[in-house]
Structures are given as structure tokens and as C-alpha cells.
Amino acid sequence: MQPRVLLVAGLLVLLACAQAIEAEDTSLLDKMQDYVKQATRTAQDALTSVKESEVAQQARGWVTDSISSLKDYWSTFKGKFTDFWDYTPKPEPSSS
């Protein structure tokens, strides 16, 4: 009779350990999900602050000004050399 009681007690201990491990796994998964959510929020906040920062706005202004200057330069260049690109020979008078 004692071996049966010992066997039942051992099985109960194993079941209790299995439930504890399963509870830990669920808890660990929840902690990881919370960590990922917090990291995502932190990254989004950092990106927002960078976008709104004075340095970023100044850099955007420099890029916009540079692109505008480049467009102006290109239109001036194109205007000066358009005669070369649109060259159509004048018809020569026929000598008949």
C-alpha cells in the first residue's frame, strides 16, 4: 500500500510542477509582450521628437532650399542651352 501512496504523491508533485512551469511560461510571454510594446512606444516617441526638433526642421529647410537652388540652376542652364537641343537646320534656298 505504501508504494501506491508514494506513486500518487509523486504524480501529484509532477503535476504541480508542470502547472507552475506553464504559469511561468505564460507570465514570461506576457512580460515579453509588454516589453515589446514599451520598446515600440519609446521608439515612436523618439522619432516624433526628432521630427519635431529644431535641428530637424532646420535640416528640412536646408534641403528644401538646396532643391530650390538646384531647380533654379537647372532652368537657367536649360534656358541657355536650349538652342543646341532644339537645333533644326534652316532649309537652304533651292537654286533652280
UniProtKB/Swiss-Prot annotation:
Component of triglyceride-rich very low density lipoproteins (VLDL) and high density lipoproteins (HDL) in plasma. Plays a multifaceted role in triglyceride homeostasis. Intracellularly, promotes hepatic very low density lipoprotein 1 (VLDL1) assembly and secretion; extracellularly, attenuates hydrolysis and clearance of triglyceride-rich lipoproteins (TRLs). Impairs the lipolysis of TRLs by inhibiting lipoprotein lipase and the hepatic uptake of TRLs by remnant receptors. GO terms for biological process: cholesterol efflux; cholesterol homeostasis; chylomicron remnant clearance; G protein-coupled receptor signaling pathway; high-density lipoprotein particle remodeling; lipoprotein metabolic process; negative regulation of cholesterol import; negative regulation of fatty acid biosynthetic process. Belongs to the apolipoprotein C3 family. It is found in: Secreted. PANTHER family: APOLIPOPROTEIN C-III. Synthesized predominantly in liver and to a lesser degree in intestine. GO terms for cellular component: chylomicron; intermediate-density lipoprotein particle; spherical high-density lipoprotein particle; very-low-density lipoprotein particle. This is Apolipoprotein C-III. One of its GO terms (molecular function) is lipase inhibitor activity. Keywords: Chylomicron, Lipid degradation, Lipid metabolism, Lipid transport, Secreted, Signal, Transport, VLDL. InterPro entries: Apo-CIII (IPR008403), Apo_CIII_sf (IPR038195). Residues 68-96 are annotated as: Lipid-binding. The gene is APOC3. Residues 1-23 form the signal peptide. It comes from Sus scrofa (Pig).
